[in-house]
Amino acid sequence: MRLRAKWVLPVSAPPIANGVVEITGDTITAVGKLPGRCHDLGDVVLLPGLINAHCHFDYTRLPVPYRDSFADWIGDIVAAKAQQTPADYLAGIAAGMMLALLAGTTTVVNIECFPELITQLPSSPLRVIWCPELIDLIRPQELPAEPAGLAPHAPYTVSEELYRRCAQSGRFITTHVAESVEEDEMFRQGRGHLYEALRTRGRDMSDCGRVGPVELLHSYGVLGRNCLAVHANCLTAGDVRLLAETGTSVVHCPKTHRYFRRAPAPLPALLAAGVNLCLGTDSLASNDTLDMFAEMRELARVFPDWLPARIVEMATTNAAKALNQSTQLGRLAASAAADLIAVPVDGHTDPYTAVVFAEKPIAFMMMNGCQI
């Protein structure tokens, strides 16, 4: 099969006007100005399927108002989760997966609180990197035998021992870190709302009042090319340097960041240091959509001087790099997976701009060589 578009956007290579993508089975076999008969998609930009590098499908039906305290919000989430049945979670996860597909996402890194439910889900073409969420209360036997990745929740809910076990597994790791001022206060200063909330629940607080959470994870051996740090909002210059030197990737969730009314994220500093930056939606508990295009538009609003190409890379090639799947995902190139989407050009002369500001429905979608 050959697909022609007004613009073919490999992302890993320059845009191709009136380009063609050749597909055999589930794999891209050629990209360029290819001769011969093609299926013409028309006035669209054809690009790789988007990669959502951080999501919680479990929370699809758990919108939780923010009450100006991150610790209180977490407590509200825990209380809301306790009211859900397995059937509620299954319905929510399936609904979230459908929302992601409808928005042109083909791969999702999903943090899964209930990995035992995964096998009960209806089949979906969506490629999900299931990462069981780990805290010290979860028993090892509850985990799938071969999870795609591991998601130790955060430094305030995961012990040094559990973090070290995750790091020693050699698997892909994703973890929340340096997300809030309250978390920063807890670890650097040994005080604050989150500190008191966890202390009263009996948490061992001996890891607090010494170093920040990023430095703590580094001391546990967690940071590195297998690690995707989620949020990383409250960073010192030393934290930025550690993330860069270890090759740790960072995922930013622009609309969730706005929901919590946080100070601007340190993305320019991370970018200048060479940290691999990705994009995610987080969950519908802190967002009103699982649409990666909406995340790109929000990022462009906050950083209007950023080139659209950089933003698209965060949702494609950069995310694939974080997953150690650069040759397979996030690009249109020979031997890559045939995951493609098309968005209307909509009057834009630059294909990257057309993608970042796309608001019309996806014009075409293919996963593993099958049109969706």
Feature map (PLM): residue ranges:
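Active-site metal-binding motif and surrounding structural segment of the metallo-beta-lactamase
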Residues: 33-47
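Histidine/acidic-residue-rich catalytic or RNA/ligand-binding cores of hydrolases
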Residues: 181-195, 240, 244, 261-270, ...
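Active-site gating loops and adjacent loop-to-helix segments of metal-dependent hydrolytic enzymes
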Residues: 60-91, 180-224, 299
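C-terminal cap of metal-dependent C-N hydrolases
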Residues: 9, 337-372
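Histidine-centered catalytic micro-motifs
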Residues: 49-60, 172-182
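His/Asp/Glu-enriched, well-ordered alpha-helical/loop segment
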Residues: 220-222, 265-345
